[in-house]
């Protein structure tokens, strides 16, 4: 099987082009890599980094019949390097859309998406909160979740980009159950092991028996108990301020809101963190950072997170 990995350029005004060149030094002969972007932009990034990437230009991914590195040049930009703008946002969306279309058809088996900027993407007509939501909609995926992954720590979020004051409205038994079931299904199918799912409480001290909040008693505990009846390895609600001490490799933490999960994750695994989308019909990862316009096109970007994101795709494809 010729296992193909798609890599999107991301926002060309950001650090994506530079990162692709830097991780290309670690490409493996047993995989096929298909870059979705701009040849002229990659050539400029090559001059910047001093890294030469040998690739073959193709029009369609089906032409990538032999193992190697390929480029689908969408030729969206008029110039190689642009400032953050509607043009850069439009280009980033075009690269993503083409890669996703190929993945949905089964022509690539995993996608590494370089960062896009939500502001400029939306200015260019992108109508989604982020790449994850676009991937889910395009693939017809109803149940999905963002997981931050590293060998040290694995964190799944019940809620993502919503105001903290609104979080309790989403801490519901059925929503928790959906995420717990999804985590188990994805780990069994893609990671090939049974996870221990650790569900965190919402309130300080996990509610202190209802004295500090009722969500644990009314929503979280019933969800955990029902999941146990289904044979799922799950515990909770755990007290959030001690839950992350000495995690094991099989632990997956289900956190109630964004910062509850992301603060400990970035403290423990900042340079090796990977954004993994659970629930999609293909593997999708991205680095754990944004476009970093402030250091873009200065050859200052560190490729560690992007390399870990690539390695995770490769490792999972090895399990197929």
UniProtKB/Swiss-Prot annotation:
Q: Where do the annotations place a divalent metal cation binding?
A: 161, 205, 258
Q: What is its EC number?
A: 1.1.1.262
Q: How is the cofactor bound?
A: Binds 1 divalent metal cation per subunit.
Task: Write down the required cofactor(s).
Answer: a divalent metal cation
Keywords, A to Z, come to: Cytoplasm, Metal-binding, NAD, NADP, Oxidoreductase, Pyridoxine biosynthesis
Give GO terms: molecular function aspect only.
4-hydroxythreonine-4-phosphate dehydrogenase activity; metal ion binding; NAD binding
Q: Where primarily located?
A: cytoplasm
Q: Where does substrate bind?
A: 132, 266, 275, 284
Subcellular location(s) per record = Cytoplasm
Q: Which reaction does it catalyse?
A: 4-(phosphooxy)-L-threonine + NAD(+) = 3-amino-2-oxopropyl phosphate + CO2 + NADH
Any one biological process term the GO annotation gives: pyridoxine biosynthetic process
Q: Name one GO cellular component term.
A: cytoplasm
Q: Which InterPro entries match?
A: PdxA_fam (IPR005255)
Report quaternary structure and partners: Homodimer.
Q: Which function does this protein serve?
A: Catalyzes the NAD(P)-dependent oxidation of 4-(phosphooxy)-L-threonine (HTP) into 2-amino-3-oxo-4-(phosphooxy)butyric acid which spontaneously decarboxylates to form 3-amino-2-oxopropyl phosphate (AHAP).
Fill in the misc note. Answer: The active site is located at the dimer interface.
Query: Which protein family is named in the record?
Result: Belongs to the PdxA family.
| PANTHER family on file | 4-HYDROXYTHREONINE-4-PHOSPHATE DEHYDROGENASE, D-THREONATE 4-PHOSPHATE DEHYDROGENASE
Which named protein is this? 4-hydroxythreonine-4-phosphate dehydrogenase
Q: Which organism is it from?
A: Aquifex aeolicus (strain VF5)
Taxonomy, top ranks, is: Bacteria, Pseudomonadati, Aquificota, Aquificia, Aquificales
Gene name, per UniProt, is pdxA
